[in-house]
Amino acid sequence: MRSAQVYRWQIPMDAGVVLRDRRLKTRDGLYVCLREGEREGWGEISPLPGFSQETWEDAQSVLLAWVNNWLAGDCEIPQMPSVAFGVSCALAELAETLPQAANYRAAPLCNGDPDDLILKLADMPGEKVAKVKVGLYEAVRDGMVVNLLLEAIPDLHLRLDANRAWTPLKGQQFAKYVNPDYRHRIAFLEEPCKTRDDSRAFARETGIAIAWDESLREPDFAFVAEEGVRAVVIKPTLTGSLDKVREQVQAAHALGLTAVISSSIESSLGLTQLARIAAWLTPDTIPGLDTLDLMQAQQVRRWPGSPLPLVDVDALERLL
């Protein structure tokens, strides 16, 4: 006997969260809970404004239609990426095919005063990997901050993300202020320039490895080994079903590329599932999941060690 619930939710964000030049005041999304006999599976559907093609209203319509079909015996997963991801997670939990083991290590997202960051990063236990957003300020300033961090902490490796913010000139201005002796400790720089060709040229000219992120979701993207390309960053909420995520990870690994499972600012429920996916598909790589602190609450499932208050399922708006 099948049953299902769909919940709508909204979490207040910390002040200062800006995506693609727009302030994100709340994170809006949906949960689906599927039950069959004694088993239960949850999934999160939370399109990311400015990045997802669909809105959460679009996703809600598709999800509710899918749930009614599933209750009638149809299991075909929808095409809409955020719905496909959430539904496939719920089905995987229901079938007990999503392993419970999770990788809760996170590459901390660094912002704020560089001196404070140096103290925080120096005290990090184990492998020191951190992420810095670049491209929000002047490229010269970004280069100076990155250089300062790498100089101060000799065993630090940085993941940088420019979100295609730079022209080739801006990219060169950034690189000019990063000591060539430190550049090998930039694990990768995600999408430095507005076009893939300019990003490839940046990697060749600077010796700084790059990673593809937005490119993975473009229709003409193909997985090929390229000089200067070291990694791909996979955001399942923007990608689609678990099967599609696994296919992309396998394609990257076949080329010797690092695959990083990364957050699209999901709630704690979605983040804990991403931690499980990372442990399953990319066990040797620290995932990019350090986004919970951007929110003011957790929901349904806790992220281990987080002090944020937990909102129980009973407090959510039920749609079905």
Swiss-Prot record:
Belongs to the mandelate racemase/muconate lactonizing enzyme family. MenC type 1 subfamily. Keywords: Lyase, Magnesium, Menaquinone biosynthesis, Metal-binding. Its EC number is 4.2.1.113. One of its GO terms (biological process) is menaquinone biosynthetic process. Mg(2+) binds at residues 161, 190, 213. It comes from the Bacteria. Converts 2-succinyl-6-hydroxy-2,4-cyclohexadiene-1-carboxylate (SHCHC) to 2-succinylbenzoate (OSB). It comes from Escherichia coli O1:K1 / APEC. GO terms for molecular function: magnesium ion binding; O-succinylbenzoate synthase activity. The active site is at residues 133, 235. This is o-succinylbenzoate synthase. The gene is menC. The keyword Metal-binding applies. Its cofactor is a divalent metal cation.
